[in-house]
Amino acid sequence: MARFLLGANYWPRSSAMSVWSRFDLGEIDEDFARMAGLGLDVVRFFLLWEAFQPQPDAVDASALERFVSVLDRAHAHKLRAMPTLFCGHMSGVNWLPAWTLDRSSHSQRFRTISGGVVSRYGIGDFYRGDLLEAQRFFARTIGACAREHAAILAWDLGNEFSNLRVPRSPAEAAHWSGALTHDLFESSNIGATGGLHGEDLGEDRHIRPSSIAESWPYATMHGYPAYSPFARSADDPEVVPFLYELTGSFSRKRVLFSEFGTPVCPPGARLVAGKPCLDDEEGGAYARAVLPRLQARGALGAFWWCWTDYDPALASAPPFDEAPHELRFGMLRADGSERPVARAFAEFARERRPLADAPPPIADEAEYYAGLPASLPQVYAKYRERHSF
């Protein structure tokens, strides 16, 4: 990582979360070529759990072949890849294999979809026991399948996994992370990180960056002003840098910001599905404000959520049927045209900015979590004062 990395989170526009069952390598190849043309370095993509591991002791061979073909196309376009495993939570839905469900645990905040239908059950305790052993089996299998593949930057253990289930303790979360990271490294000779998100800092979900990231070469974080109650606006340019610095303070690791972005407003609207949004020009200005802040303050890189809007024909299917704002986060519109945010990333890529030094800690982890919920807005207010001009 000699320079600040730029990337995009990726599901194809035509299939979204159905990519592995409606697989179109030609579409993926075209998208990767366009990413490379914009100067992006990394594509973060997602392995829908039930598509890859239909049973706890079985991995789908055809899915593995498709996975390797995606890695090969990334490498052909000189992109690095961050494959995200055990997905898991995505766009307001928990997509889960039937064998992971706990019939004594009902789904709560997020819908569970398993086998293409909504289930009333939530996931069992995947941080330990049989479910952890099944994940370790998958990690060893896929690691061996892609051992030392030149495209892989790092494995990602999961996307905002505390949205699936909160661990019983920070120690349990750290054990889960350490076991999977170990298995992935032993089988693939490639390190792993994990998709933490702003809610892991906004409430006590029994996740501590200091322990869960101990085995990672660097931490990753996701954050959105539109989903952050302490933000001053939907385009507050300090929210993402603040979450980055807070994660670095607690983990004592370098941090890559692997998700930031904004839902795009329909014409003439200021809300979409009741959530704040930005128009195209505002979204581009937001990216132009955040990218240099992250780079100057020592982040390893920044990935936009997400590469493309989805085909409007998917609007009646999950997750978009209940979360229509998720249709329009893209660097590209559904017709393939570029939004201003794509140009913002391309311009930043041409500057080839180097990595800056990581900043000193801005808060103490133990004091911060003990002081929640008040500590978050308090620390953010001090952070804004320090970076006011």
Region roles according to the model:
Residues L64-F67, A173-S177, V240, D280-A287, ...:
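Amphipathic alpha-helical segments in well-structured domains
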Residues M1-S215, F250, D311-L314:
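Active-site mouth of glycoside hydrolases
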Residues S105-V118, W305-F389:
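Aromatic-rich peripheral "rim/lid" segments of glycoside hydrolase catalytic domains that contact
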Residues L294, A302, F345:
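Hydrophobic, well-ordered secondary-structure elements that form the walls
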Residues A150, A299-Y310:
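Extracellular serine-dependent O-acyl
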Residues G143-A144, Y244, L291:
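Generic structural signal for well-ordered alpha-helical scaffold segments
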Residues P12, F46, N159-P170, M221-R232, ...:
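Active-site clefts of carbohydrate-active enzymes
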Residues A171-L271, L300:
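Glycoside hydrolase catalytic-domain groove-lining segments
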